[in-house]
Amino acid sequence: MFLINLLIYIIPILLAVAFLTLIERKVLGYMQLRKGPNVIGPYGILQPFADAVKLFTKEPLRPLTSSISMFIIAPILALTLALTIWTPLPMPHTLIDLNLGLLFILSLSGLSVYSILWSGWASNSKYALIGALRAVAQTISYEVTLAIILLSIMLINGSFTLKNLMITQENMWLIMTAWPLTMMWYISTLAETNRAPFDLTEGESELVSGFNVEYAAGPFAMFFLAEYANIMAMNAMTTILFLGPPLNHNHTYTCTISFMFKTMLLTSAFLWVRASYPRFRYDQLMYLLWKSFLPITLALCLMFISIPIALSSIPPQM
């Protein structure tokens, strides 16, 4: 029974990720005035399955000088963390109803750095290591902004529970009242998931492929799946935090359809950004965070703390 539950949980996420890769290739194709994958199946719809069969049936190669255990553990850890991050998300029902759901997601997104760092270090390649170190610096930096934004949301929400956010946003979505936070959160999630224009870790022109340059076949596919699962999870988080439930939220299916639609819309924006913008320079990436996002998020966090105290003359009841 446990195995069946596990498969029911994992397979839909992996299927969604598979079709997201197809949609991305199609979107990029049409934006560059070409067709994209259109050979395997009608309109290329079976392309992800062909890719999966090809990757998982090839021999997984590894460099002779690599550290075997870390080299193997890194992609497994990446995919495990990417799948685990979905457990506390209310869609509208959660798999695990955690009291500290916001903290759990923040800590898991921070842990994903280790898989990238291990893969870069264990590969024993200078390109992989440079890509991994870039990823660590980038992710840790943007984690600061994400943490402060989540703290601000927690002050509005009154608790760390994600389900409470649905009750908080019954009358008005938080994007209406905290739109600067929404914009900064969305841009920070782009950086957190190493997506264009912040894909410094995978700079093809200078690092060949980045931290996963020495990976092939199955382990490479695991990193690929983890990246796209993280993208969808982050967009699901954006929907929960700022775009709330629909106005008629008494019906579970209405909530679920609305949640799926908004997550798909945000994910499509990720693809649009990738097709439209060039890569940031590394100093611009850090300047954006430390000189722009950090002061603004701190100021907004202080505002959310001070307004209830100023208006009620007493500390808010948490």
UniProtKB/Swiss-Prot annotation:
Keyword Mitochondrion: yes
Protein EC: 7.1.1.2
GO biological process entries: aerobic respiration
Any one GO molecular function term: NADH dehydrogenase (ubiquinone) activity
TM spans (from-to): 3-23, 68-88, 100-120, 136-156, 172-192, 223-243, 253-273, 294-314
Topology relative to the membrane: Multi-pass membrane protein
Keywords, in A-Z order: Electron transport, Membrane, Mitochondrion, Mitochondrion inner membrane, NAD, Respiratory chain, Translocase, Transmembrane, Transmembrane helix, Transport, Ubiquinone
Acyltransferase among keywords: no
Catalytic activity, as annotated: a ubiquinone + NADH + 5 H(+)(in) = a ubiquinol + NAD(+) + 4 H(+)(out)
GO cellular component, one term: mitochondrial inner membrane
Location in or out of the cell: Mitochondrion inner membrane
Protein origin, superkingdom: Eukaryota
A Pfam cross-reference name: NADHdh
InterPro entries with a match to the protein in the record: NADH_UbQ_OxRdtase_su1/FPO, NADH_UbQ_OxRdtase_su1_CS
Family the entry assigns: Belongs to the complex I subunit 1 family.
Record function comment: Core subunit of the mitochondrial membrane respiratory chain NADH dehydrogenase (Complex I) that is believed to belong to the minimal assembly required for catalysis. Complex I functions in the transfer of electrons from NADH to the respiratory chain. The immediate electron acceptor for the enzyme is believed to be ubiquinone.
Protein name: NADH-ubiquinone oxidoreductase chain 1
Gene: MT-ND1
